[in-house]
């Protein structure tokens, strides 16, 4: 299946859009009405992926020996080495499927937020589980036929449009990523009113997208439906802030360009439930062993979507607290802690993760900051770049300084008018130069 061609027709052909939506709804309802089938589906897809990798990937052929069956696939997956970006770069074609030709046209790129972008071939087979899982989430959120979806992402808007105060573009299709895409790249005090005016004209039932962009828009609106947060780490406090502003529930979604995990988070808490329909999720320690319930580890995934480069026991670089497994086969992530690299080092050399330190600290001061970014170039010293919100004051600054000083840091604050986003329109909260 070539997703590029599907996206093309979804954008230009209303009949294809209608058929695709009906197809996704059919399977979404089927899975939602029969959750007892999820674990068996997962086992069948895991068996199929391992068998495919054995037949088509030189790299896996040396590790997967003998027939792969449903009664031994779990044993096989646990015996395989972990896969990371360095292995993929060094092995390249050995890890790729032998169905990938020299002139293969469909390639994907990860965002490279860790400084390690990945370029890999895209090949899809069978049921489009990405669309099915997206539809299951929308139906859980109350989606009705005809509801309008919009997104906040990093799309690039033409200079001509921006000169006319247009900071959005039409999407490929309403489902799943929105009929209208608002760019987070151009949000500021001058442009925010045009975003809000267009939102009011569009009247979406669902807003999905980067938490930092949606948060920034709310804060800017304060200065001068249903929300689904995707693609960035965020906290319960941020969900509550957005929920109170829009007066609607806020759901979380966790996934990657590598199409190997699809997890959802309900409005009331921070727990993620990883879909067994989409992939097989583990949480492992530094030795690659699965952690116990309540312990911290790295999220490792095996996806059922991507065959061009089978992501089998792939290290995501994300840390989480393992919460066990539901009776339906969903892996529980009690708390997503962010990326392994999202940490700073105090004067004693202690590694401190941002999620627990800042996001989990319920610091009131951050309600009075439009956006911010940390830079660390030496142990124990942090520079913080801040775009002030209107209510920012000396007391807010004191609270921030006190937080860092009490935890063993020297803090230098720079006040700026703008903080550059990534190419994809995401907000990087940390530039870490220490290795």
Identify what each model region corresponds to.
Residues 168, 268-272, 430:
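Short, hinge-like loop/turn segments at secondary-structure boundaries
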Residues 59, 63, 216-217, 237-241, ...:
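Phosphate- and divalent-cation-binding pockets in alpha/beta enzyme and binding domains
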Residues 185-192, 200, 204-239, 252-257:
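Adenylate-forming
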Residues 225, 234, 238-325, 340-341:
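Conserved AMP-binding/adenylate-forming
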Residues 1-109, 116-131, 135-148, 155, ...:
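Nucleotide 5′-phosphate-binding alpha/beta core
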Residues 128, 150-212:
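AMP-binding/adenylate-forming
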Residues 53, 110, 149, 207, ...:
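Residue-level signal for inorganic ion chemistry
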Residues 207, 305-409:
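AMP-binding/adenylate-forming catalytic core of the ANL superfamily
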